[in-house]
Amino acid sequence: MKTLGEFIIEKQAEYPEAKGELSGILASIRLAAKIIHREINRAGLSQDILGFAGSENVQGETQMKLDIFANETMKKALLAREDVAGFASEEDDNFIAFDSERNRNAKYILMTDPLDGSSNIDVNVSVGTIFSIYKRISPIGSPVTIEDFLQEGRKQVAAGYVTYGSSTMLVYTTGNGVNGFTYDPSLGLFILSHPDMKMPAEGKYYSINEGQYVTFPLGVKKFIKYCQENDEASKRPYSSRYIGSLVSDFHRNLLKGGIYIYPTSTVYPQGKLRLLYEGNPMAFLAEQADGMATDGFQPILDIKPTELHQRVPFFIGSKTMVKQANTFMQTFTE
């Protein structure tokens, strides 16, 4: 049995020039995940953390009380160790430059969706936390700048998510494969349960909100019909599975094989998911697990961000299925 802490130390030992900052950040995320896990597990017993907060985030989306709690928990956990120079979140209007001397001398910045799928909390459906870590490009010792956050996804040094469901799991990559750790509440430890995770090249599930079908571009409509057609050779029709939480849908497809799609639409002309907080970290994980992630035309990780809350159409999952979806997008243009 190997714990997350032991795994981090073991991997750090493989890089003697490393000073442990990245390990410290992962330890902060581990702590935040435990705290968020605790609050989610008692959500049905406490009205203090259930329901709407009465505020909106920068995208105009109504914030849940747990959105704000998870966001503040991540900030506090990172500030306590001073291994991060700056922080950006889906829930905040602007990035935050941590301004202690040690923070200014830190090499990394972190971006997060602190509680993905939070609208599901009140009905006891699984949710998640997503995180993404980059090396800063501004001078060490100075406050971070917007350019530190607007880096292509390929420059990520680590990314991962925590899924809070029937069990709580932390899944992450540092660019050398994907590993999953299951939380044992009796021990208070994350235990390595899914080493070297690989996404099946082909899958049998497609995940998309078909209730918005009429708003989708033609290529997506054609691909949905393709998924529903009978074809013994390709083992179609595929099964539709859509939870409404990116982390939950991706996690199932990572284990079982499948594709998750959140395309452009007449309601969301640029797509709905955020490139920096959702797209890039999940795309990094997918590629490290032999999967694929695109906007229907190009790899997500190759997109140069232009703003903190930039939206992007999103196709992610088993490589064969994403390639098929890309073909439909590129063939059936409007």
Swiss-Prot record:
<dbReference type="Pfam" id="PF18913">
    <property type="entry name" value="FBPase_C"/>
</dbReference>
<dbReference type="GO" id="GO:0005829">
    <property type="term" value="C:cytosol"/>
</dbReference>
<feature type="binding site">
    <location>
        <position position="242"/>
    </location>
    <ligand>
        <name>substrate</name>
    </ligand>
</feature>
<dbReference type="InterPro" id="IPR020548">
    <property type="entry name" value="Fructose_bisphosphatase_AS"/>
</dbReference>
<keyword id="KW-0479">Metal-binding</keyword>
<feature type="binding site">
    <location>
        <position position="113"/>
    </location>
    <ligand>
        <name>Mg(2+) 1</name>
    </ligand>
</feature>
<comment type="subunit">
    <text>Homotetramer.</text>
</comment>
<dbReference type="Pfam" id="PF00316">
    <property type="entry name" value="FBPase"/>
</dbReference>
<dbReference type="GO" id="GO:0000287">
    <property type="term" value="F:magnesium ion binding"/>
</dbReference>
<comment type="pathway">
    <text>Carbohydrate biosynthesis; gluconeogenesis.</text>
</comment>
<dbReference type="GO" id="GO:0006000">
    <property type="term" value="P:fructose metabolic process"/>
</dbReference>
<feature type="binding site">
    <location>
        <position position="113"/>
    </location>
    <ligand>
        <name>Mg(2+) 2</name>
    </ligand>
</feature>
<dbReference type="GO" id="GO:0005986">
    <property type="term" value="P:sucrose biosynthetic process"/>
</dbReference>
<keyword id="KW-0460">Magnesium</keyword>
<dbReference type="GO" id="GO:0006094">
    <property type="term" value="P:gluconeogenesis"/>
</dbReference>
<comment type="similarity">
    <text>Belongs to the FBPase class 1 family.</text>
</comment>
<dbReference type="InterPro" id="IPR000146">
    <property type="entry name" value="FBPase_class-1"/>
</dbReference>
<feature type="binding site">
    <location>
        <position position="272"/>
    </location>
    <ligand>
        <name>substrate</name>
    </ligand>
</feature>
<feature type="binding site">
    <location>
        <position position="209"/>
    </location>
    <ligand>
        <name>substrate</name>
    </ligand>
</feature>
<feature type="binding site">
    <location>
        <begin position="116"/>
        <end position="119"/>
    </location>
    <ligand>
        <name>substrate</name>
    </ligand>
</feature>
<dbReference type="InterPro" id="IPR033391">
    <property type="entry name" value="FBPase_N"/>
</dbReference>
<feature type="binding site">
    <location>
        <position position="278"/>
    </location>
    <ligand>
        <name>Mg(2+) 2</name>
    </ligand>
</feature>
<feature type="binding site">
    <location>
        <position position="116"/>
    </location>
    <ligand>
        <name>Mg(2+) 2</name>
    </ligand>
</feature>
<dbReference type="InterPro" id="IPR028343">
    <property type="entry name" value="FBPtase"/>
</dbReference>
<protein>
    <recommendedName>
        <fullName>Fructose-1,6-bisphosphatase class 1</fullName>
        <ecNumber>3.1.3.11</ecNumber>
    </recommendedName>
</protein>
<keyword id="KW-0963">Cytoplasm</keyword>
<keyword id="KW-0378">Hydrolase</keyword>
<feature type="binding site">
    <location>
        <position position="115"/>
    </location>
    <ligand>
        <name>Mg(2+) 1</name>
    </ligand>
</feature>
<keyword id="KW-0119">Carbohydrate metabolism</keyword>
<dbReference type="InterPro" id="IPR044015">
    <property type="entry name" value="FBPase_C_dom"/>
</dbReference>
<dbReference type="GO" id="GO:0006002">
    <property type="term" value="P:fructose 6-phosphate metabolic process"/>
</dbReference>
<dbReference type="GO" id="GO:0042132">
    <property type="term" value="F:fructose 1,6-bisphosphate 1-phosphatase activity"/>
</dbReference>
<dbReference type="GO" id="GO:0030388">
    <property type="term" value="P:fructose 1,6-bisphosphate metabolic process"/>
</dbReference>
<feature type="binding site">
    <location>
        <position position="90"/>
    </location>
    <ligand>
        <name>Mg(2+) 1</name>
    </ligand>
</feature>
